[in-house]
Amino acid sequence: MTTSPPPPPSSPSPSSPTPASGTPAHAKPLRRLTARGRGEAHRAASPLELFFDLCFVVAIAQAGMQLVHSVAESHTGEGILNYAMVFFAIWWAWMNFTWFASAYDNDDVLYRVVTLIQIAGVLVLAAGVSQAFEDHDFLAVVVGYVIMRLALTAQWLRVARSTEGPERAMALRYAGGVALCQIGWLGLLFLPDGGKPWLFLVMALLEMCVPVYAEKDHPTSWHPHHIAERYGLFTIIVLGETIAAATIAVKVGMEENDALDELLPIAAGGLLIIFSAWWIYFVVPIHGRLRSSKEAFQWGYGHYLVFASAAAIGAGLEVAVEQTVGEAHVSTLTASAAVTLPTALYLLTVWALHSRHFKVGLAQQAVLPVTALLVICCTFLGDWAVLAAGLVSALAVATGTTLTARMAAREQGPRSATQTV
């Protein structure tokens, strides 16, 4: 989102925890919050970051559950709108923490405490998701979001205190931008229901402009491999939550309605979709593409659709189960679309962010877009829609793997011949 060149790789500051350090990270309770090196070796996600992710998935699960209820009660449009707004709050807070931690995580006591406050904020948000969907009462959602954002503001103020020059100015712009945006979010509490989506749209755009403004002169020193790992781990956790939600729905349907025969196609198709979603996301390493702030931010922002669609697949599978056993007041077409449309969106987004940068030739490039189109067509197959979508997704994985293997074999042939000569 910004064309500023990334800063040159720097050595980790003395205050930063590094694998080579013989001093435990918690030995000094308070340390200066300075940038870690972009070229730092063996950088990996920390236990605190993994704990952070797991707590955020609690909020995602609540949003998915309410989306199921909305669609099952034929309030699809309203449910999707509320889901988009709540998911943005969860995703944006997660994303900002992730990039901040990649650049400045020093794992001291104060850093941990402020991060735990952010976790508390997302749990407050999660507690208010049902009221936001059912009563249009966003009080708990806004309060939880503001808690997370003000905690991040405090972290940026720590950076400003620990640095100087352009880096300090960048930190102050971040702190000021994030804090000012919270005033706008509080307006959601006072607007009538019809005005809330419009204010949300404005505030979401303003929030996403803060990094562009803050890093215009001095980009943060995020770590490409660490960022790619963090996004990958969160994708795994979201897909895991999707499997858990769908499994519970199938289990309840079998126990309460004795509908094993009717639910087997949904269960099998759902597993194939989720397995394929995992395979497609991780088929190629992406950290090599994150060479500049512009590329990295576009990639990071695009993951709103990746995460939201991945979680929505699970919600769609629950709707399909409820419709099959007669507990959802929607048609088979609507229930099928609840699975196929987020699946198609996931495939297209992963192709746009990942696959298209590595695929060679028209055949390889066309696999995921064509698969997305075929998955949408599966919507009209009635009770077999989910199974068909799963088979199409699995076929895409098989096709992509075969094409890649054939290209590798063709490239290996001339190389071997050259070596022989």
Annotate each predicted stretch with a short phrase:
Residues M1, P12-S16, A388, S393-A398:
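Generic low-polarity alpha-helical segments
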Residues G194-L199, G382-S393:
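Loop-to-transmembrane alpha-helix initiation sites
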Residues G64-G79, S102, Q131-A132:
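Short, hydrophobic transmembrane alpha-helix segments
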Residues L54-H69, C378-T379:
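Alpha-helical transmembrane segments of multi-pass membrane proteins
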Residues T3, G22-L50, C55, Y83-V113, ...:
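Predominantly late transmembrane helices and immediately cytosolic-facing juxtamembrane segments
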